[in-house]
Amino acid sequence: MNRIGMGLVGAGFVGPHHVDAVRRLGFVDIVAVAGSTDESGQSKAEALGARKGYGSYQALLDDPDVHVVHNATPNHLHYEVTSAALARGKHVVSDKPLAMTAAQAKRLVNEAQRAGVVAAVTFNYRGNPMVQQARTVIARGDLGTPHFLYGHYLQDWLLKDTDYSWRLDPEKGGPSSALGDIGSHWCDLAQHVTGLRITHVLGDIATVIKKRKKPLGSRDAFQAGTSDEVDVVDIKVEDLACVLVRFDNGARGSFSVGQVCGGHKNDLMLEVCGAKASLRWRQEAQNELWIGHRDKANEVLAKDPSLLDAGARGYAHLPGGHQEAWADAFCNVMREIYRCIAAGPPYPALPPMAATFEDGFRANRIVDAILESAADGGAWTRI
C-alpha cells in the first residue's frame, strides 16, 4: 500500500487527536502542520511529530506530499480552508460544523463532488463499537418500529462567567454555540443509529450567562483558569437549548443541550423506544448498552467482541473488560475514511461509519432550523 500524506490545519484542542488517530493506522505519514505564523507552525509540527511546519494553510496546500487535509480550525475558517483544499484536489477531513451556514455547507457538497475526492466530516461518536451495536440491533428489528427518541448532551465547561471560548463569538463560532457544537452530535447520533431523518424541529433556546469575562490571552476549549486581564463581553449565542423533533417515520423526540450544567463533563445520551423494546447509550459509560424490556429483565450489554454482532465487532479492538474510549472511536472513523482514500480513484463511497459532506450539510440545516424556530417563538420548522 502506498503511503498517504496527511496535513493538519488547526492544532488546538482537537487537532492533535486527528494526528494521533491517523498515526495509529500505520500507513499514513504526518507530513505537515499549518500554524498562523512560521514560528507557530514549526513549533506545532515539532510537538506533533510532523516533518514540516508552515505559517499558513495556503503553504500547506502547496505541498505535493500532502494528500489529505484535516481541517480543525475554528468554525469561521472551515469553508475557506476546505474550499481551497478541494480546489487543489486534496481529500478533506473536516471537523463539524462543515461550515458556518447551511448555504456554505451546500456549496462545499457540490465542490467536493466536482473534485472527485474523499470528503468527510468528523461525527466521531459513530465510531464507538456500542453505537454500531445499537445501529445493528435497531436495523434487525429487535426494538420494533421506533416511536420515541430522547436524550441530552450536557457539559459544564461554560458554567462560570470566567469561562470563555471563541465558540461564544458569532464571528468565529457562528450563529449557534451549544446547538452547533454539541447538539449537532446528538442529532447525527439519533439519525445514524436509527436510520431515520429529522424532518421538523421546535426550539427553545437561552443564554444563561449573558456577560462573560473574556481573557485578553487565548484559551482552548475546556481549559480552566482565570486571567487578571479580562474584557467583559455580551454573549449573543445560546448556552442552553431544549428541542422537540419529528422524524420521517412519524416518531417523536426531544433532546436538551447545555454547557452550563454542573457535574456533566461530556454527557451525551440517546434512548430509542420502539414497539418491542428500548435501547440506551451514554457516552460517559460508552462501553455499555442498556436494553429495556416489558416482560423480562432489562439487560446491560458490556463491550466484548465475542458478544457483539458482526457489524460492531470489527470496531472493538480489545477483549471484554478492557475499556475503549473516545480516542478509539475517533480512530475507527479515520480508519474507514482512509480505507476509501487508499482504494484509489474512482474512490468508493464512504461507509455509514464516516459522515459525508451531505451529512454535514444536513447537520447545518437542522441547527439553522432550530434557531429559526426559536426566533419565531417556538414554531414547528421544517428541515
Spans of features found by a protein language model:
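Beta-loop-alpha module in the N-terminal Rossmann-like domain of NAD(P)-dependent dehydrogenases
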Residues: 39, 48-111
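N-terminal Rossmann-like dinucleotide-binding module
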Residues: 1-48
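Predominantly a Rossmann-like dinucleotide-binding segment in NAD(P)-dependent oxidoreductases
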Residues: 125-235, 289, 377
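Glycine-centered short loops/turns at secondary-structure junctions
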Residues: 89, 116, 141, 250, ...
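C-terminal helix-rich "cap/oligomerization" subdomain common to oxidoreductases
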Residues: 1, 8, 68-70, 106, ...
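Rossmann-fold dehydrogenase core element
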Residues: 107-124, 144-148
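C-terminal glycine/acidic-rich active-site capping loop/insertion
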Residues: 206, 210-249, 270, 276-354
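Hydrophobic residues in well-ordered beta-strands that form the structural core
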Residues: 15, 54, 71, 94, ...
